[in-house]
Regions:
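DUTPase catalytic domain/fold
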Residues: 1-225
């Protein structure tokens, strides 16, 4: 598994096995591609109660369209990259903060990983770690995408997963933990009890060896039999 160089990135974009649109040639670095900040952001509102990670999060955020935005110290926002990205089953990606932005105290993250088969406008989070306010601008280069070979290619890439919560996202998506498979199972129970106890029991019930999980055909396809 190797990181794609600028030459291989250009090659993959040329043959359309990777799509980055709009594509700016000057944004290709020696082993990454710079991505730019979109116009819409979501700002968390202060609420009385603690945020439950399994609640729907839409009402917590105020959506705003920006040309520029001032992040005060410790401010946190959800944003998205302007580019639409599509990766094949043979390539995954890592999103990293730009060094220049880190030096002014901005922490930019996209949960750092992009699955093979992903398609959409990536959501990113931005936090100001600077003791001073920092101004950001739509269209500025906000993060870098590092592309990596997946060998052999993913058997079930992100586009084929039934629970791919962020496939085809249009940017600025809030957390969708309430769609996690295990939480959906918990919600279907008549006698729910403690969610932590349910998760612990589920882990015990589903713990199996890889030999028990794979069918003979799957083992043959993976070269294990």
């Amino acid at each position: 598994m190797g990181v794609l160089s600028d030459a291989r990135i250009i090659e993959k974009i040329y043959d359309e096995s990777i799509i980055i649109s709009p594509f700016i040639y000057d944004h290709v670095q020696p082993a990454s591609v710079d991505l730019t900040l979109g116009k819409k952001i979501k700002i968390p509102n202060r609420i009385e109660n603690a945020v439950n990670v399994y609640d729907e999060q839409q009402e917590i955020y105020e959506e705003r369209e920006i040309e520029q935005y001032t992040l005060k110290p410790n401010d946190f926002i959800i944003a998205f990259v302007r580019e639409t990205i599509q990766l094949p089953a043979s390539i995954s990606g890592f999103v990293k903060n730009r060094s220049s932005l880190a030096r002014v105290g901005l922490d930019v993250s996209a949960s750092s990983y992009v699955n093979p088969g992903y398609h959409g406008q990536m959501t990113i989070t931005i936090k100001n770690m600077n003791p001073n306010s920092v101004v950001i601008h739509s269209g500025m280069r906000i993060c870098q995408l590092i592309l990596v070979d997946v060998e052999p290619e993913a058997n079930i890439d992100y586009s084929k997963k039934e629970d791919a919560k962020y496939q085809e996202e249009k940017g600025g998506e809030v957390a969708k933990l309430y769609l996690d498979r295990e939480f959906q199972e918990y919600n279907r129970l008549k006698d729910k009890g403690s969610i932590s106890n349910f998760f612990e029991q589920r882990l015990r019930d589903n713990e199996k060896s890889i030999d028990d999980i794979l069918s003979d055909e799957q083992k043959r396809n993976l070269g294990l039999k």
